[in-house]
């Protein structure tokens, strides 16, 4: 590394006997970043990084992760503090605006979200076009994308107020659409939002109330879901967030952008892992079977995979998993299932064995956020096909914060990844008779 008069540090890259100086961009915390934006214009080369494992696509002030230390912070606040002391809409305000709200700001924000929770009545007809067996994520994906047809005034943006209104509308309407997707999938009538309830209470009300019976929200369940929403609100530049940013970089409307995020999140390697954990725990069946399945997980020739362990970023205990483990116990205790829930018993024993096993320690395979969340959802009465829908409901806040930040960033331009072409160099066309 070398430095020049302005105290900027440089990395040196040697290509074909020529040395190129690349500026090192300083992070406020965490890894610094080598600026390779001029490598192509100056060295006539691209960089190769499958999966973007070592590539920063943007500058961001929203979320910081230290995977080695197991740290997750939003705008500088530790995730555990936010989960234990805050509520979801306060965290939403923090992610979007950069600061925690004062009392007036919080009240104004929550009122705006409640005001926009209703969806256009014509959207109900869209739901009726799906067959009864449709996955709720498929319904949600289509419904969110269709919002652009109902709000053409927000297809182009010129003022900061437009960004804010769009974010609020999205945060407000996604839970309504999520609950509608569930109700339609089980053949029950839709339940309208109730502005007298707070955000989490209202979501539970729309999920479980019926026209003939009101749903009384259990405060322990409400508190648990509030924590789950906070823990899933944002997670830096993951697959779905990057998808939203890439779509947004083209100028696509925000409803379309969020629908692409939902599509990406639907992938089993991203948002569907907690459902896979439940299926795995059911397959294991009992605590006595755990050693057998641990051995299967170590066997390269066995198709069994230990779900809920390991993470693309965390090489330590996922801080979100630590919160959810205790939350899981609180929920099951409230529901009278703490001592007789077989899935929890298997999960706790599986974690204890894995954390002492050299195979998992060497590979830094620790429980992640998906390991306990599915057990909580199941205890709440939320079916597995809704797990990813709830993930998307919470992550919408992060998507909108990232989308807003992207539009306010003067460095951002339309995303255009490059490639290493390894195909045919040149071939002459032959007619079909000559082939």
From Swiss-Prot:
Active site: 311, 370
GO CC annotation: cytoplasm
Pfam families found in the cross-reference section: Citrate_synt
Annotated GO biological process: tricarboxylic acid cycle
Catalytic activity: oxaloacetate + acetyl-CoA + H2O = citrate + CoA + H(+)
UniProt-listed PROSITE patterns: CITRATE_SYNTHASE
GO terms of molecular function: citrate (Si)-synthase activity
Pathway(s) annotated for this protein in UniProt: Carbohydrate metabolism; tricarboxylic acid cycle; isocitrate from oxaloacetate: step 1/2
InterPro entries on file: Citrate_synth-like_lrg_a-sub, Citrate_synth-like_sm_a-sub, Citrate_synthase, Citrate_synthase_AS, Citrate_synthase_bac-typ, Citrate_synthase_sf, Citrate_synthase_typ-I
PANTHER family: CITRATE SYNTHASE
Further comment found in the protein's record: Citrate synthase is found in nearly all cells capable of oxidative metabolism.
Protein name: Citrate synthase
Source organism (scientific name): Rickettsia bellii (strain RML369-C)
Taxonomic lineage from the root: Bacteria, Pseudomonadati, Pseudomonadota, Alphaproteobacteria, Rickettsiales
């Amino acid at each position: 590394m070398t430095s020049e008069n302005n105290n900027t540090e440089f990395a040196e890259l040697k290509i074909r006997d020529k040395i190129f100086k690349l500026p090192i961009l300083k992070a406020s915390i965490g890894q610094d970043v080598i600026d390779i934006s001029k490598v192509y214009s100056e060295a006539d080369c691209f960089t190769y990084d499958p999966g973007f494992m070592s590539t920063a696509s943007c500058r961001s002030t929203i979320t910081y992760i230290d995977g080695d230390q197991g740290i997750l912070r939003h705008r500088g606040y530790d995730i555990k503090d936010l989960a234990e002391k805050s509520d979801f809409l306060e965290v939403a305000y923090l992610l979007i605006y950069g600061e925690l709200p004062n009392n007036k700001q919080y009240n104004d924000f929550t009122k705006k979200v409640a005001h926009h929770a209703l969806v256009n009545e014509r959207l109900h007809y869209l739901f009726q076009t799906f067959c009864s067996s449709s996955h709720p994520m498929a319904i949600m994906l289509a419904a969110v994308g269709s919002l652009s047809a109902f709000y053409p005034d927000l297809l182009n943006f010129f003022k900061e107020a437009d960004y804010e209104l769009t974010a609020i509308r999205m945060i407000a309407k996604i839970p309504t659409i999520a609950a509608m997707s569930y109700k339609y999938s089980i053949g029950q009538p839709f339940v309208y939002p109730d502005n007298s309830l707070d955000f989490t209470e209202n979501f539970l009300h729309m999920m479980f109330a019926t026209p003939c019976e009101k749903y009384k929200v259990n405060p322990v369940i409400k508190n648990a879901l509030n924590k789950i929403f906070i823990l899933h609100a944002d997670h830096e530049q993951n697959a779905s967030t990057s998808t939203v940013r890439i779509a947004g970089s083209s100028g696509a409307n925000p409803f379309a952008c969020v629908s692409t995020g939902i599509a990406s999140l639907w992938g089993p390697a991203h948002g569907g892992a907690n459902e896979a954990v439940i299926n795995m725990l059911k397959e294991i069946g009992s605590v006595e079977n755990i050693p057998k399945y641990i051995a299967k997980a170590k066997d390269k020739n066995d198709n069994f995979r230990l779900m809920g362990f390991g993470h693309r970023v965390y090489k330590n205990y996922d801080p979100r998993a630590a919160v959810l483990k205790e939350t899981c116990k609180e929920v099951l205790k409230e529901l009278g299932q703490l001592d007789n829930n077989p899935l929890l018993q298997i999960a706790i024993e599986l974690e204890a064995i894995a954390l002492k096993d050299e195979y998992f320690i060497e590979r830094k395979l620790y429980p992640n956020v998906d390991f306990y969340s599915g057990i909580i959802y199941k205890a709440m009465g939320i079916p597995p096909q809704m797990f990813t829908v709830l993930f998307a409901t919470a992550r919408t806040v992060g998507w909108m914060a990232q989308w807003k930040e992207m539009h306010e960033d003067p460095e951002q331009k339309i995303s255009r990844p490059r490639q290493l072409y390894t195909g045919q160099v040149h071939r002459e066309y032959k007619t079909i008779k000559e082939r």
